[in-house]
Amino acid sequence: DILRLWIASTDFRSEMVASDEIFKRVSDQYRRIRNTLRFLLGNINDFDHKTDAIDLNNLLELDKWILEEFKDLQKDVLEHYESYSYHLVVQRIHNFCVNQLGGVYLDIIKDRQYTTQQNSEIRRSAQTAMKLMIDQLVILVAPILSFTAEEIWQNDADLKANKASV
């Protein structure tokens, strides 16, 4: 997947350069994306979307905000895929994972996830948002990070139950 990420993150219209430094940077990008996916997956392992999901209108404002940000990500990524701008796909997904998710959202909800009761509405609100995001994020990364997407898919019982593979 790291090699695929390097290829995708390079604008194919210009010369492709390979070096140890570039592969270290790409490995770091990969690690951040993968860790974000694994964090999302780990925080929904006790969540059944059919019985535990909170209605979107009743989500906490922070959870509504991240879903709006995610909707923007989806729109941008699909446009970049359609124009074969894979380097922009990688940039957009990486920036979302690092800035909106890792830099803001996941940092804020950690207390909510770890200190509130398992079935509390505020915890389920975050889990609803995370479930909605991971279900689509795994599809967005699959063309580039196919092995990672498949790993996440196989470890999400809900996704695996609906379809055998990403």
Where are these regions (language model features)?
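Helix-rich, typically C-terminal accessory recognition domains appended to large enzymatic cores
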Residues: 2-166
